[in-house]
Amino acid sequence: MKNLSLLAVLLISNFCFSEYLEKLVIKKVVDGDTVHLYHDDTIYKVRLIEIDAPERNQPFGKDSTDYLKRLLNEGKVDVEISGTDRYGRKLGRLYWKGRDINREMVIAGYAWVYDDYVTDKSFYENQSKARELRKGLWKDSNSIPPWEWRKRKKQ
């Protein structure tokens, strides 16, 4: 029984772990939800959590990437890393001058709330408002979420 309790504590503590890094240099904006950051001689490939931006070859993909570049034009961000995805990218939330960049992408209509992975349900309010105001990708009433786009491309 003690072993099971210890295992549960270890699993929970590992799941809840997050690392906060400050003033990382932006090396590259890959697309609307992925960036490469530099800090202490390390390159971090970071996938923005809570959101899924259009793929580069998808309608609004370039717009989404360009918008993220504009948001990050000052060159340094803080990041809260909460894990690693199956591609080895760090999963994180970016902050620039106190602004939650992940949320800003949804507010501006350049990313969807990533239904399968969202933990902060308030992102849905931001998405509904962007849709209502027809911002960004919501200008097209038939826009396709990236997860559906990827699925269709595999077929």
Where are these regions (language model features)?
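Small beta-barrel nucleic-acid-binding modules, primarily SNase/OB-fold domains
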Residues: K2-S5, N14-Q155
